[in-house]
């Protein structure tokens, strides 16, 4: 407390630092729920990220690295680490350094004039992203990356006063860096922190953290937006969001380009809810939930989040009312109901609403994913409906358990978006025919000009000339990713077979 009071006194005593005083208050008022961990075991496990790119060159897979680290240092456990609270450990020197550097970049960069003080406090000023171990990071990152924006600041063509233009210029440079993306990372680790993040290795969390550290160190406002669960998957996903000087929302899934949200397929991606991480505590949400129940699921316990689902969904229900006929009978012990998404063999709360056992409505929910209603009682979920989905037409489809057996045909057992990179690689591929095994004389039978469809694509030969040999040549960097090829006679129902 004494250290934090030093910060307030320093800026309060000088009238020219009135904004810095307000910024200091913003950080301190929202600091109580921030914690972090320290310890040798954490440092040992974080070497995983710094060694990823080296391991790739040696063809060592991430899971093998995790297994090796576990054998060497033992299983990872937060209980073995030192638990620290920001309000106890953050000293005046650290906080003042962070505030002074944040103000420096906000005031010196030309696009800073289009960043409000409120946005500055939320999206540039914070000294941390999540629960990473604290360190001084702003000056080092500023000196390393600020030269990347020299050409932008000198430009007479680009709108150097637009934060999005600065973000695009910077991220176009960051995209050129060597990186290693993998969803296979040690489980249970806190955020890796600014130094490890610059190894540009890990999952979407680590790569998003990297972009945020660099952008904020250079005075570019940004946030981490996330879906707690994919609508058609078992995991969540996160990315970095930006706004231009007019307030239009953009996003980047590093190392992709920055794209406008409303014009991208992100809006159509299957999901239930999207939230934005904020440094400030959502006191309105916290007060409303605590009014209804003192026991809240961990995800909503200290909500440093705001709901931005409406910004990321084209088809969503402003108010999703759950019919009383779908609810199980009984009396809930909690007045909070949670909308849950499927996560492997369990259900994970992603939204909440007031519940009296009969009336229930959730706000801003993207339809189509499978969901279920639950309350949080005695430390576990108590379910109030069978799993259900809402169709585009607004009808509920309930999956009621049955003892009967039903045969089904599965056309996919893996997220379909993973197929796209292979389908796109075939564009430009060509089928050729010849009567010469060396194809010294050949004829184009079919050129792939658009992305093939899933499962099966019908292709009709351009030539009616009989040929004995057929080959497929993939485009440059296409890798010839073809699973199966079958040939049919005109009007034939059975595939031809070679000799």
Where are these regions (language model features)?
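Secondary-structure boundary elements
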Residues: 2-199
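Hydrophobic/aromatic-rich core segments of domains that either
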Residues: 156-173, 184-194, 200-294
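Beta-strand-rich domain onsets/edges
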Residues: 290-317
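Structural motif
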Residues: 307-310, 319-333, 417-421
């Amino acid at each position: 407390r004494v250290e934090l009071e030093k910060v307030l006194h320093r800026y309060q005593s000088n009238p020219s630092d009135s904004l810095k005083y307000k910024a200091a208050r913003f950080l301190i008022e929202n600091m109580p729920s921030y914690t972090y961990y320290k310890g040798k075991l954490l440092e040992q496990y974080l070497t995983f990220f710094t060694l990823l790119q080296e391991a790739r060159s040696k063809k060592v897979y991430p899971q093998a690295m995790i297994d090796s680290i576990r054998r060497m240092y033992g299983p990872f456990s937060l209980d073995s680490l030192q638990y620290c609270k920001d309000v106890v450990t953050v000293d005046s020197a650290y906080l003042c350094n962070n505030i002074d550097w944040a103000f420096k970049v906000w005031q010196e960069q030309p696009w800073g004039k289009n960043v409000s003080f409120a946005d500055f406090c939320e999206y540039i000023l914070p000294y941390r992203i999540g629960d990473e171990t604290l360190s001084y990071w702003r000056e080092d990152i500023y000196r390393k990356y600020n030269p990347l924006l020299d050409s932008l600041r000198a430009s007479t063509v680009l709108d150097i006063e637009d934060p999005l233009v600065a973000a695009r210029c910077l991220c176009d440079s960051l995209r050129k860096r060597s990186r290693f993306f993998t969803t296979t990372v040690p489980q249970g680790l806190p955020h890796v922190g600014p130094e490890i993040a610059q190894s540009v290795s890990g999952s979407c969390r680590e790569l998003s953290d990297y972009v945020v550290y660099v952008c904020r160190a250079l005075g570019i406002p940004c946030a981490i937006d996330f879906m707690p669960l994919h609508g058609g998957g078992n995991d969540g996903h996160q990315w970095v969001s930006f706004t231009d000087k007019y307030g239009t929302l953009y996003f980047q899934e590093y190392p992709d380009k920055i794209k406008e949200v409303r014009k991208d397929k992100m809006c159509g991606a299957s999901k239930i809810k999207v939230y934005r991480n904020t440094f400030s505590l959502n006191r309105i949400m916290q007060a409303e939930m605590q009014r209804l129940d003192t026991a809240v699921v961990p995800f909503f316990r200290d909500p440093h989040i705001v709901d931005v689902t409406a910004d990321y969904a084209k088809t969503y229900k402003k108010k999703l009312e759950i019919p009383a006929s779908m609810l199980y009978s009984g009396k809930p012990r909690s007045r909070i109901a949670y909308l849950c998404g499927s996560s492997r063999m369990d259900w994970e709360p992603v939204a909440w609403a007031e519940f009296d056992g009969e009336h229930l409505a959730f706000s801003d929910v993207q339809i189509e994913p499978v969901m279920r209603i639950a309350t949080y009682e005695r430390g576990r979920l108590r379910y109030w409906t069978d799993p259900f989905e809402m169709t585009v037409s607004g009808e509920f489809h309930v999956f009621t358990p049955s003892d009967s057996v039903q045969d089904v045909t599965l056309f996919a057992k893996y997220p379909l978006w993973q197929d796209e990179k292979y389908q796109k690689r075939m564009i430009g591929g060509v089928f050729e025919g010849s009567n010469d095994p060396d194809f010294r004389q050949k004829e184009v039978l079919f050129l792939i000009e658009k992305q093939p469809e899933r499962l099966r694509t019908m292709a009709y030969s351009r030539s009616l000339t009989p040929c004995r040999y057929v080959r497929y040549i993939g485009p440059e960097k296409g890798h010839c990713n073809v699973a199966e090829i079958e040939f049919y006679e005109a009007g034939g129902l059975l595939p031809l077979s070679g000799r």
